[in-house]
Amino acid sequence: GLFDIVKKIAGHIAGSI
């Protein structure tokens, strides 16, 4: 769902830090 997309984006940002 939409929250899965949010989590995926958040995970990408977390991996970029």
Swiss-Prot record:
<dbReference type="GO" id="GO:0042742">
    <property type="term" value="P:defense response to bacterium"/>
</dbReference>
<keyword id="KW-0044">Antibiotic</keyword>
<keyword id="KW-0027">Amidation</keyword>
<comment type="similarity">
    <text>Belongs to the frog skin active peptide (FSAP) family. Aurein subfamily.</text>
</comment>
<keyword id="KW-0929">Antimicrobial</keyword>
<dbReference type="Pfam" id="PF08256">
    <property type="entry name" value="Antimicrobial20"/>
</dbReference>
<keyword id="KW-0878">Amphibian defense peptide</keyword>
<protein>
    <recommendedName>
        <fullName>Aurein-3.1</fullName>
    </recommendedName>
</protein>
<keyword id="KW-0964">Secreted</keyword>
<feature type="modified residue" description="Isoleucine amide">
    <location>
        <position position="17"/>
    </location>
</feature>
<dbReference type="GO" id="GO:0005576">
    <property type="term" value="C:extracellular region"/>
</dbReference>
<comment type="function">
    <text>Has antimicrobial activity against L.lactis, L.innocua, M.luteus, S.aureus, S.epidermidis and S.uberis. Probably acts by disturbing membrane functions with its amphipathic structure. Shows anticancer activity.</text>
</comment>
<dbReference type="InterPro" id="IPR013157">
    <property type="entry name" value="Aurein_antimicrobial_peptide"/>
</dbReference>
